[in-house]
Design a protein with these regions (language model features):
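RNA-contacting regions in translation and RNA-metabolism proteins
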Residues: 1-156
């Protein structure tokens, strides 16, 4: 709870430093803490495709954990509901790509994306039996490849 309070204080101060105001909502489950910062004019803290948000999360985690001496807590930051919106949009997109892969029979490599986005892709398509996904390459150029599933041999 102390890490959460420290993270809240840091985020509100960060928002103020760019001339924005925000309110925080904290959700704590065991060692997992999620702090949501909501308000107007916070887009600068999200950045293109959430790249700045990831940096804000990393800095907030380091500052909060060091100040509290707690390095076991997992801290996740969301700003303006970006992560939920990104998950929904990315899930919709990769479902369409998977449908195209099945229709054409050709694999398709997605653009390079950070680890949290790759996890969304794999999770969104995990229940499908007509395609397979895997990641290839090295960060920051690691990408997900969606391929048609190998045909199942019929037992005759």
């Amino acid at each position: 709870a102390q890490v959460a309070a420290e993270a809240e204080k840091f985020l509100v101060g960060l928002a103020a430093s760019i001339g924005a105001t925000g309110e925080t909502v904290v959700n704590i489950q065991g060692d997992d803490i999620e702090v949501q910062l909501n308000g107007a004019e916070l887009g600068l803290l999200v950045g293109p495709r959430g790249s700045t948000l990831q940096a804000v999360q990393d800095i907030t985690r380091v500052v909060s954990q060091r100040r509290m001496g707690d390095h076991d807590t997992r801290l996740r930051i969301d700003i303006g509901g970006y992560r939920a919106k990104r998950k929904e949009a990315l899930s919709r997109f990769v479902t369409q790509v998977a449908d195209e892969v099945v229709a054409t029979g050709s694999a398709r490599a997605l653009e390079a994306m950070p680890s949290p986005d790759r996890k969304i892709v794999h999770d969104a398509l995990t229940g499908r039996t007509d395609i397979v996904t895997h990641s290839e390459g090295e960060d920051p150029n690691r990408r997900v490849v969606i391929s048609p599933a190998a045909p199942v041999a019929s037992a005759e």
